[in-house]
Amino acid sequence: MIPVVALVGRPNVGKSTLFNRLTRTRDALVADFPGLTRDRKYGRAHLAGYEFIVVDTGGIDGTEEGIETRMAEQSLAAIEEADVVLFLTDARAGLTAADLAIAQHLRSREKTTFVVANKVDGIDADSACAEFWSLGLGEVYQMAAAQGRGVTNMIEYSLAPYAEAMGIVKQEDGDDDEEEREYTEEQAEAEQKRLQDLPIKLAIIGKPNVGKSTLTNRILGEERVVVYDEPGTTRDSIYIPMERQGREYVLIDTAGVRRRSKVHETVEKFSVIKTLKAVEDSNVVLLVIDAREGIAEQDLGLLGFVLNAGRALVIAINKWDGIDQNIKDRVKTELDRRLGFIDFARIHFISALHGTGVGHLFESIEEAYDSATRRVSTSMLTRIMQMSQDDHQPPLVNGRRVKLKYAHAGGYNPPIVVVHGNQVKKLPDSYKRYMMNYFRRSLKVIGTPIQLRFQEGGNPFEGMNSKKLTVSQERRRKRMVGHIRDKNKD
């Protein structure tokens, strides 16, 4: 399970700076749900060999009068759901009453907490950080988030105990190695068989009260009741194995399966972290949207995280029964307008309460999973790449035409196509999008995003003395030397 790291501290201690550095511009802000999360931000990060979800808890303004009355409810929830808490302090400002109040709350929650003294650049760090030991939360880690000094070591130091306890294997930190991976035909076939033999992990997600519990009950059968919100279970989703028409599934339920009577009595508890962790751990995501409410910003935020995670996607527009035809037409128009960027995903109009259209969901779920794990040979990918060049040549870069050499599979779920060539890193985004769409159409990929990665061809003269003559220059030099010698003899 991917760990969750919460950044906690009073305002202006550098939480947002650290958040931006951890998530990087390409991962950036994943979800910021108005009205639900208030000042919480969520991002995906990969650093020091670990993948994790990082949460910026925002405006925690603790005072000596009592942290419980000053901390926002959402920030408290972030601390409760986190696996590791990084308590940021300001080494320049020193220890404050707000720091003491926050520390008291963290001690009472018995969370795995690491004190981080930020802004240590340009000062006597050891002297400035000495007073933070009085917080009683263990060692004080020094860092300068704005400059990036100490960030990687701090993440490794804080996540290593959790990773060891959970059996998480540390990965080699380096995107290039992952991008350069090339499957042999035997490896590709073995990987596809392995994926096809595994149960499909299906995460059912959506904002509160869109019918996730009702849909899960409908899929599992009315008689199936799973207890939810027992002590100790609020942080993690429920994993429910099931079988349908000979195919095994594992439903990752983020809402909890309640008795039908209680679905209408209790406002569904929404946990952003629980949802994001379920997406990370799934193969296919089923996003449930309320037809009566249309596409909300929260839905788009969840879609953004699904796309960033590279997960296969099926969309269910729930509560479709009983809606006036004019409203249905308006909803379909809105779907075309706002969801045009995910035209690869199947959209189903269902009624979880009455079961209308629910059975057809699994056709699209299996189709999406099969597309995400399908084996495609190097020769096929190279042929498609060549056809895309024939139809639309790559642009000129510095007066030279970008040359694409070959393509191969770089991974599954999502499908990754690695294209090798000269100057490929300089290809404009418009041409990369053209190639991605060309591969999608040619491979008939449905229900899953497809990723293209580009690798520069090796330079055979790299590392050689730049003054060394070429073969033709060497021949010319010999002719000139011979000519001079003959002339001198005369």
Swiss-Prot record:
EngA-type G domain boundaries: 3-166, 200-373
Domain (KH-like) ranges: 374-458
Annotated spans, Disordered: 470-490
Record flagged with keyword GTP-binding: yes
PROSITE patterns recorded: G_ENGA
Keywords assigned by UniProt, alphabetized: GTP-binding, Nucleotide-binding, Repeat, Ribosome biogenesis
Binding site for GTP 2: 206-213, 253-257, 318-321
Pfam families: KH_dom-like, MMR_HSR1
CDD domains: EngA1, EngA2
A molecular function (GO) term: GTP binding
Leader sequence residues: none
Superkingdom assignment: Bacteria
Sequence positions that bind GTP 1: 9-16, 56-60, 118-121
Subunit structure and binding partners: Associates with the 50S ribosomal subunit.
NCBIfam families linked to this entry: GTPase_EngA (TIGR03594), small_GTP (TIGR00231)
Function: GTPase that plays an essential role in the late steps of ribosome biogenesis.
Membership in a protein family: Belongs to the TRAFAC class TrmE-Era-EngA-EngB-Septin-like GTPase superfamily. EngA (Der) GTPase family.
Entry protein name: GTPase Der
Provenance organism: Shewanella pealeana (strain ATCC 700345 / ANG-SQ1)
